[in-house]
Amino acid sequence: MAPIMNQKLHLNAFLVTVLALAAPAFAHHGTGVAYDSTKPTVVKGIVTDFAWRNPHAQLFLDVKDESGTVQQYAVEMNSPGVMIRQGWTKRQFKAGDEVSITVYPAKSGARVGSCIGTCKVVINGTDATPKVTVEDR
Protein backbone atom coordinates (compact mmCIF):
# COMPACT_ATOMS: atom_id res chain seq x y z
CA MET A 1 0.00 0.00 0.00
CA ALA A 2 1.34 3.44 -0.88
CA PRO A 3 2.45 5.60 2.09
CA ILE A 4 -0.08 8.36 1.30
CA MET A 5 -3.00 5.91 1.15
CA ASN A 6 -1.81 4.37 4.40
CA GLN A 7 -1.81 7.83 6.04
CA LYS A 8 -5.33 8.54 4.77
CA LEU A 9 -6.54 5.20 6.08
CA HIS A 10 -5.06 5.93 9.53
CA LEU A 11 -6.51 9.45 9.53
CA ASN A 12 -9.98 8.15 8.62
CA ALA A 13 -9.77 5.46 11.30
CA PHE A 14 -8.73 8.11 13.84
CA LEU A 15 -11.63 10.40 12.89
CA VAL A 16 -14.18 7.59 13.12
CA THR A 17 -12.83 6.69 16.58
CA VAL A 18 -13.01 10.29 17.81
CA LEU A 19 -16.59 10.66 16.58
CA ALA A 20 -17.60 7.35 18.15
CA LEU A 21 -16.13 8.40 21.50
CA ALA A 22 -17.81 11.82 21.34
CA ALA A 23 -21.31 10.38 20.87
CA PRO A 24 -21.82 9.27 24.51
CA ALA A 25 -20.64 12.66 25.79
CA PHE A 26 -23.07 14.42 23.47
CA ALA A 27 -25.87 12.09 24.52
CA HIS A 28 -25.24 12.99 28.17
CA HIS A 29 -24.66 16.72 27.78
CA GLY A 30 -26.40 17.43 24.50
CA THR A 31 -29.98 17.72 25.73
CA GLY A 32 -30.39 20.98 23.85
CA VAL A 33 -31.82 22.67 26.94
CA ALA A 34 -30.05 25.76 28.22
CA TYR A 35 -31.06 26.99 31.67
CA ASP A 36 -31.16 30.60 32.86
CA SER A 37 -29.16 30.66 36.09
CA THR A 38 -29.99 34.35 36.59
CA LYS A 39 -33.72 33.70 37.10
CA PRO A 40 -34.40 31.23 39.92
CA THR A 41 -38.10 30.39 39.69
CA VAL A 42 -40.41 28.69 42.18
CA VAL A 43 -42.52 25.95 40.57
CA LYS A 44 -45.46 24.51 42.54
CA GLY A 45 -47.27 21.39 41.49
CA ILE A 46 -48.31 17.81 42.09
CA VAL A 47 -45.81 14.99 41.50
CA THR A 48 -46.78 12.65 38.69
CA ASP A 49 -43.48 10.73 38.46
CA PHE A 50 -39.95 10.66 39.85
CA ALA A 51 -37.35 8.90 37.69
CA TRP A 52 -34.31 7.89 39.76
CA ARG A 53 -31.83 7.20 36.96
CA ASN A 54 -28.46 8.19 35.54
CA PRO A 55 -27.15 10.52 34.38
CA HIS A 56 -29.75 12.73 36.13
CA ALA A 57 -32.89 12.03 38.11
CA GLN A 58 -36.02 13.70 36.78
CA LEU A 59 -39.08 14.96 38.61
CA PHE A 60 -42.35 15.41 36.72
CA LEU A 61 -45.06 17.72 38.03
CA ASP A 62 -48.55 18.77 37.04
CA VAL A 63 -48.47 22.57 37.33
CA LYS A 64 -51.33 25.03 36.81
CA ASP A 65 -50.46 27.91 34.50
CA GLU A 66 -51.84 31.46 34.85
CA SER A 67 -55.13 30.47 33.20
CA GLY A 68 -55.60 27.45 35.48
CA THR A 69 -54.74 24.91 32.79
CA VAL A 70 -52.67 21.97 34.08
CA GLN A 71 -49.37 21.54 32.25
CA GLN A 72 -46.61 18.99 32.81
CA TYR A 73 -43.31 20.42 34.05
CA ALA A 74 -40.04 18.46 34.14
CA VAL A 75 -37.21 19.13 36.58
CA GLU A 76 -33.71 17.85 35.84
CA MET A 77 -31.95 16.95 39.09
CA ASN A 78 -28.57 15.66 40.23
CA SER A 79 -27.35 12.14 39.58
CA PRO A 80 -28.59 9.52 42.05
CA GLY A 81 -25.05 9.22 43.48
CA VAL A 82 -24.93 12.92 44.36
CA MET A 83 -28.50 12.85 45.64
CA ILE A 84 -27.68 9.98 48.01
CA ARG A 85 -24.77 11.99 49.43
CA GLN A 86 -27.19 14.88 49.92
CA GLY A 87 -29.49 12.67 51.99
CA TRP A 88 -32.11 11.92 49.32
CA THR A 89 -33.57 8.53 48.41
CA LYS A 90 -35.35 7.13 45.38
CA ARG A 91 -38.54 7.36 47.43
CA GLN A 92 -38.09 11.10 48.05
CA PHE A 93 -41.06 12.01 45.88
CA LYS A 94 -44.29 10.06 45.47
CA ALA A 95 -47.09 10.56 42.98
CA GLY A 96 -49.59 12.97 44.52
CA ASP A 97 -47.06 14.86 46.67
CA GLU A 98 -47.49 18.63 46.67
CA VAL A 99 -44.13 20.16 45.79
CA SER A 100 -42.64 23.62 45.69
CA ILE A 101 -39.20 23.65 44.09
CA THR A 102 -36.84 26.45 43.05
CA VAL A 103 -35.41 25.78 39.60
CA TYR A 104 -33.46 27.54 36.90
CA PRO A 105 -35.93 27.64 34.00
CA ALA A 106 -35.21 26.77 30.39
CA LYS A 107 -34.15 29.83 28.39
CA SER A 108 -36.45 28.70 25.58
CA GLY A 109 -39.56 28.96 27.73
CA ALA A 110 -40.11 25.18 27.66
CA ARG A 111 -41.69 23.73 30.80
CA VAL A 112 -38.36 22.36 32.02
CA GLY A 113 -36.14 23.49 34.86
CA SER A 114 -32.86 22.54 36.47
CA CYS A 115 -32.36 21.72 40.12
CA ILE A 116 -28.77 20.56 39.77
CA GLY A 117 -26.66 21.54 42.73
CA THR A 118 -28.80 22.74 45.59
CA CYS A 119 -32.26 24.20 45.29
CA LYS A 120 -35.01 24.84 47.82
CA VAL A 121 -37.52 21.99 47.92
CA VAL A 122 -40.72 21.73 49.98
CA ILE A 123 -42.68 18.45 49.91
CA ASN A 124 -46.18 18.43 51.44
CA GLY A 125 -45.30 21.52 53.50
CA THR A 126 -42.02 20.10 54.86
CA ASP A 127 -38.66 21.60 53.90
CA ALA A 128 -36.74 18.88 52.05
CA THR A 129 -33.93 21.05 50.68
CA PRO A 130 -30.98 18.72 50.08
CA LYS A 131 -27.95 18.91 52.30
CA VAL A 132 -24.76 19.98 50.60
CA THR A 133 -21.60 18.15 51.54
CA VAL A 134 -18.00 19.10 50.87
CA GLU A 135 -17.82 16.33 48.25
CA ASP A 136 -20.68 17.92 46.29
CA ARG A 137 -18.93 21.26 45.81
Per-region residue spans from a language model:
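Short boundary/loop segments of OB/S1/cold-shock single-stranded nucleic-acid-binding domains
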Residues: 26-41
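Bacterial N-terminal signal peptides that target proteins for export
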Residues: 2-15
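N-terminal signal peptide c-region/cleavage motif recognized by signal peptidases
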Residues: 22-24
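Short, structured beta-strand/loop micro-motifs enriched in basic residues and often containing a Trp
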Residues: 77-85
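Conserved hydrophobic positions within beta-strands
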Residues: 43-47
